[in-house]
């Protein structure tokens, strides 16, 4: 007779059960491992996309502005200390008489390259010898950029900056404005608490004439102020570049 009805022994049943559980465990381990690998890959792709998204939609506006200013400042490298001193003296005179700036800038832009000296170059540059566009193009481009940056400011701002230069406050105001820019340019709106060191009367007025509002020690920021603040920061940096 066959042995179809013979039941496996207890030892055999335990062995079969153990084998089934091990097979199940291995399948589960593989599935878990596979899931982890897939999850890790998915997370990495997500983070990569997120980083790309941030780079595209949220560029560092302050860094871009600094790069633009640095490119302009590089053009001033040929202006030596004596010429910078004379240039700053004449620029300060124009800052308290803003009507002079536009006329002088127009004169520089239309200067004949064959003209070795002009009235405008004497007034702006002082003893700049035989400077002209072909001999010192970079210097002219820098001065034009400086004058244009000053033209974007109002009369009150120009007079405040002239006072800041005369009283060695310009660098302090640049640092204060950088603090504001770093904490505002990449957000549409914000209420920024200003430290006491940034709440000097002159600096507060510079911000006020740029359109910003300060309540107590809180700056009320809106992205519409990016342009006037950028203009102010650019002019301050270019002026500081000329100071000796």
Curated annotation (Swiss-Prot):
It holds the Pfam family Orthopox_A47. InterPro entries: Orthopox_A47. Belongs to the orthopoxvirus A47 protein family. This is Protein A47.
